Amino acid sequence: EDDIIVVGAGMAGICTAAAAAEKGASVTLFSASSQPISRGGSNFSAYNKVVEEYGIDRLDPVDFFYHEERAASFTIDQKMWMRGYNNSEEAMNWCIDIVRSKDVEVFLESDNRLDNGPDYAIGFGAKGDDTASASTGQQNAVEAMEAYALEQGATIIYDTVAKQLVRDEETGRVTAVVAQKADGSYVKFVGHKGIVLATGDFSANKEMIAKYCPQILPIVGLEDAETDYNRGFALTGL
């Protein structure tokens, strides 16, 4: 039992665990993978100290946000988008300071250009690494954030697969997660203040793909394949 339970050890989950532990919460993160996982790159914020160091002007969000919202027929949560715009700079600067303290280079990706959006996205690399393309150094960042989360007192457990959410019958709030360990036994993680699901999309879930996007099931090759929770980002596609 802890204040916060985080499910998933990607960049989102690791950063959540680190931030909560930094603020004094008791945190347990568990993941189906056997290590922190990065399957992408292109870390975006509305502005940040690295962009400022390069002398790039602050993004005017109007055209960019309008284009992105229109692409989704304006069915998105616009309040959430604006929260991202208003708070992403603070969050990214926090992350940049941490990974730099762990000897990770922070740079702007060379292959990220949008017609009516920002010409920058944050990438990461090992010291001396001159590669600045999307995703190539993301593992450096997630491992640095994992180290910081542990330093702040977070507990991280791997090879543990979430199986069922437990909801409060009166409020409907998710209060716990039942998971299966590598030895086949089950464990219940109770979060008194919150449960954070940071497990990514359902591109590796055969049942959900079959229901919501059956036409791609043969293409992604999941018909008879076992899920590999440790698979990293594939440059040829997921």
Regions found by a protein language model. Name each.
Residues 182-185, 189-238:
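Glycine-rich loop(s) and the adjacent beta-strand/alpha-helix scaffold that form part
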Residues 38-42, 170-172, 201, 206-210:
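Short acidic, glycine/serine/threonine-rich loops at helix termini
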Residues 9, 31-33, 159-161, 179-182, ...:
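Fold-independent oxyanion-binding glycine-rich loops
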Residues 84-186, 206-207:
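Conserved redox-cofactor binding core of oxidoreductases
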Residues 2-28:
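N-terminal Rossmann-like FAD-binding beta1-loop-alpha1 element of flavoenzymes
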Residues 51-55, 63-99:
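Dinucleotide-binding Rossmann-like beta1-alpha1 core, especially the glycine-rich loop
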Residues 33-57:
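Conserved N-terminal glycine-rich FAD pyrophosphate-binding loop of Rossmann-like flavoproteins
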Residues 14-17, 92, 235:
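Generic hydrophobic/aromatic pocket-lining and core-packing "Φ" positions
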